[in-house]
Amino acid sequence: EPLFIGIDKVWSYINQPASNPLLHISEGPYIYDVPSFNEEVIREAILNAVAHRSYQIQSDIVIKQYPDEITISNAGGFPIGVDINNILTVNSIPRSKRLTEILQKTGLVERSGQGVDKMFYYCIMESKPLPDYSKTDAYQVNLTFQAAIQDKAFLFFMKEVQESRAEKLNVFDLLTLDKIRKGINDSLDPNIIEKLRKEQLITVNEGTTYSLADKYKQFIPRKESIKGVTSQQLQKVNECFKTHDSISKSTLMETFNGVLTEKQVRNLISRM
């Protein structure tokens, strides 16, 4: 079938409720439904595979979908001059210039290099692992996308930041924020660091280390706790409820015999 029809059919096959379920996440008033696999990302990856594959090698573009990941592979390694480290910064030379021009003029793909930017951009915005090219070799490009959301707080943080801006942060800004979230402080672009600092998106700590702004920390869920009661004590109370319909002071005294005094048991009851 023609590519224009085939790409829609491939996405329809991938985007089934059972194979591409929505991930429901919430924190306070914030509620988002995030697809396991982002349509923009997957379409761009497939079209990149079509545009950059080697047509001198008789091999199909292979798409494998699993519950937690999708892999897309195409014949031929990276185009000349492109590798894992510079894939976002170098302008690649297409293997088929005419095919690439057709895809660009029909609006199916972005101009050279922009498609990869889009894949990284959406993965970071949804707090998913970055596109993984680690299994690529001289004979094939192998690209993997993971479904799992790594950090819900970061997702909420990025949504709020971008939605409040007239000029959106670009993919390099997002990459820097993502590295700081992971505790990576080496090889960061000083110009981007200064930009993010001025916009109060990061904090500069001692020893040239960085952390995300307090706004990010507000989205980190707080662990529920009862002041003055240890987790071990709560576990013992939970075990009591498994064997008793109700718990009296005497029951707790038996449970904590030799561990807590009567006064401490009364104090425990008052705090629960």
PLM regions: where:
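C-terminal regulatory or interaction extensions
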Residues: E1-M272
